[in-house]
């Protein structure tokens, strides 16, 4: 695929600086790249802030959302916000990232364990995965063996999976995006 803007979304515990030279290297391949800094929030607050920051960059559709680490499960919700703003998502790349999981029924905390928190006994809600997800092709780029299970799951989902080591991450990501 030929992306409009490649949006690099860092792990909620990190900052955009964690991408290092990757954005600039991807630009050298002729890609339009934004790496928004979404600090100090997680879950749906990360989704909301990312949507605002992405909008401020005036990206070109179709977007390719690249998620790292714990932001992986948030990509479907971030995509919903982009589609609502008439910025279609053309693909997803999970870079050493956790994967979105199917919806599950809410968990009821065991009051004997002290997890009721005074909110009806429910645990904190997970970020929902839209029923129509994925509406665009997905790929997985593995850098670390710590993500062997996620890479395996991505392959079982029929997604292209690539591996890379520094300094070849940009080249591997570019090749993966072309296959989407």
Model regions and ranges:
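Generic structural signal for beta-strand residues in well-ordered domains
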Residues: 26, 58, 85, 131-133
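The alpha/beta-hydrolase serine catalytic core
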Residues: 88-180
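Nucleotide-sugar donor-binding loop of glycosyltransferases
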Residues: 37, 69, 144
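A short acidic, amphipathic alpha-helical/loop segment
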Residues: 21-22, 77-78, 150-153
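Surface-exposed, flexible loop/turn segments at secondary-structure boundaries
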Residues: 14, 41, 71, 100, ...
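Active-site catalytic motif of lipid deacylating hydrolases and related acyltransferases
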Residues: 1-61, 156-172, 176-179
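Short hydrophobic segments within beta-strands
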Residues: 8-12, 66, 95, 141-143
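Serine-dependent carboxylesterase/thioesterase catalytic core
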Residues: 50-119
